[in-house]
UniProtKB/Swiss-Prot annotation:
HAMAP family: MatK. GO terms for molecular function: RNA binding. The lineage of its organism: Eukaryota, Viridiplantae, Streptophyta, Embryophyta, Tracheophyta. GO terms for biological process: mRNA processing; RNA splicing; tRNA processing. It comes from Quercus palustris (Pin oak). Usually encoded in the trnK tRNA gene intron. Probably assists in splicing its own and other chloroplast group II introns. The gene is matK. Keywords: Chloroplast, mRNA processing, Plastid, RNA-binding, tRNA processing. This is Maturase K.
């Protein structure tokens, strides 16, 4: 960012929050594509090099300079001058440029807010596994949880309107709205969920920023009202950026719900409520009664419908008792159960036993959805029987084993926090036997005959259990050390869900 600050003249644009001129600067797109303008946007245009990539950007900027966007109507979508002849390439270039430009003011505000503030940066909190120690500490003491599916915006205009509350440059937002409108017209005159899905896949970074702005707006109101009775005592949620008309909207929002909730501070007062979220799924847990959880359910549904114009229904929020239902979160099944323990107490000459049964959070591998993901990837059939992977039969034996080993290690790494290892052993069995069947099919043999013919040392690394490594390194390791190794381990280097585990 510092390298491009002089080229983009960020100091001058930041004074008036002008983002519109940055769209017509080549360095914006160079920053967006990491110094190389053909990293992935030219995958469909083989033969272009860096110089020709720069020429594409220059021609696109010249075209945008010459166009009068007010004269272009929706009926002219077949002859679209905004994208030119190569719609896919130009839309990727523009979306990357829009994304990196709109991120600049947020980045500068974050840097300015951190200057002079003694804030310790915990980089390990970036890991999604860091959520589970929090769940293990808090959830055993709670009673009810609400599984919340945050509704998906039905129209891209909703995302632009949400961004309007934080970005002040009207010209930039107008061009952004026009870009999304023209992109939608190129696919269909009617904007549907399918067109939004296509846009999110072809422009992942840009759509992710718009969607995160929508989530940030929703959570800013949610946390503001949640902390209002305690005078905003919660400070661990991070840096709150400048936001336009926040208090005015909160007052209007309070008037809308004054009939249902006459006293909002009393309604929100719950010191034992906890909230976690990953992407579009969140969990709201409380120690209070089901009545309060149902009030929160009604409140959230009305919030989405009245404030964000997003259709939502009560079925998107399920309220369950933690002791009787499992939570499906981050591709783990988590449940609260009793953990009976007997403690011997000695008082003078008398000794007696105490039965203690504290609650404990169990995290388990979702075996059925995971087998479904393996079946979809052609590692096994629908019932979990391993099959050969046809697409890898043309690779060398070493490459086949190495790829299966990489998948197996990644799954073991992600599900290292599972309370019960039995389900993970079954997944490893499917992958190992699928590897053997793939090799046997390549050599035109059966799996049993292939194993008899090949030296088992060839598969030694693949078939060695993780629990066996500590015995190989420390042959006389204590039982407590081995038990600690076989227990739950939360790694702090996992920043996204494994591809096969993401079955939601």
């Amino acid at each position: 960012m510092e390298e491009f600050q002089g080229y983009l003249e960020l100091d001058r644009f930041q004074q008036h929050d002008f983002l519109y001129p940055l769209i017509f600067r080549e360095y914006s797109y160079a920053l967006a594509h990491g110094h190389g303008l053909n990293r992935y946007m030219l995958l469909e245009n083989i033969g272009y090099d860096n110089k020709s990539s720069l020429l594409i950007v220059k021609r696109l900027i010249t075209t945008m300079y010459q166009q009068n966007y007010l004269k272009i109507s929706a009926n002219d979508s077949k002859q679209n001058p905004f994208f030119g002849y190569n719609k896919n390439l130009h839309s990727k270039i523009l979306s990357e440029g829009f994304a990196i430009i709109v991120e600049i003011p947020f980045y500068l505000r974050l840097i300015s807010s951190l200057e002079g503030a003694e804030i310790v940066r915990f980089y390990n909190l970036r890991s999604i596994h860091s959520i589970f120690p929090f769940l293990e500490e808090k959830f055993p003491h709670l009673n009810y949880s609400a599984d919340i599916l945050i509704p998906y915006p039905a129209h891209l205009e909703i995302l632009v309107q949400t961004l309007r509350y934080r970005v002040k440059d009207a010209s930039y937002l107008h061009l952004l709205r026009f870009f999304l409108h023209e992109y939608s017209n190129c696919n269909s005159l009617i904007i549907t969920n399918k067109s939004i899905s296509i846009f999110s896949k072809s422009n992942p970074r840009f759509f992710l920023f718009l969607y995160n702005s929508y989530i940030c707006e929703y959570e800013s109101i949610f946390l503001f009202l949640r902390n209002q009775p305690s005078h905003l005592r919660l400070t661990s949620s991070g840096v709150l950026f400048e936001r336009l008309c926040l208090y005015r909207k909160i007052e209007h929002f309070a008037e809308v719900f004054s009939n249902d909730f006459p006293v909002i501070p009393c309604f929100l007062k719950d010191p034992f409520m906890h909230y976690v979220r990953y992407q579009g799924k969140s969990i709201l847990a409380s120690k209070d009664t089901p009545l309060l959880m149902n009030k929160w359910k009604s409140y959230l549904v009305n919030l989405w419908q009245c404030h964000f114009d997003v259709w939502s229904h009560a079925a998107s929020i399920r309220i369950n008792q933690l002791s009787k239902h499992s939570l499906d979160f981050l591709s783990y099944f988590s449940s609260v159960r009793r953990n009976p323990a007997v403690v011997r107490n000695q008082m003078l000459e008398n000794s007696f036993l105490l039965n203690n049964a504290p609650n404990k959070l169990d995290t388990m591998v979702p075996i059925i959805p995971l087998i479904g993901s393996l079946a979809k990837a052609k590692f096994c059939n629908a019932v979990g029987h391993p099959i050969s992977k046809l697409t890898r039969a043309d690779l060398s034996d070493f490459e086949i084993i190495n790829r299966f080993l990489h998948i197996c290690r990644n799954l073991s790494h992600y599900y290292s926090g599972s309370s019960k290892k039995k389900n993970m052993y079954r997944i490893k069995y499917i992958l190992r036997l699928s590897c053997v069947k793939t090799l046997a099919r390549k050599h035109k043999s059966t799996a049993r005959a292939f194993l008899k013919r090949v030296d088992l040392e060839f598969f030694q690394e693949f078939f060695t259990e993780e629990g066996g490594f500590i015995s190989l390194i420390f042959p006389r390791a204590s039982f407590a050390l081995r038990r600690l190794y076989s227990g739950r381990v939360w790694y702090l280097d996992i920043i996204f869900i494994n591809g096969l585990s993401n079955h939601e």
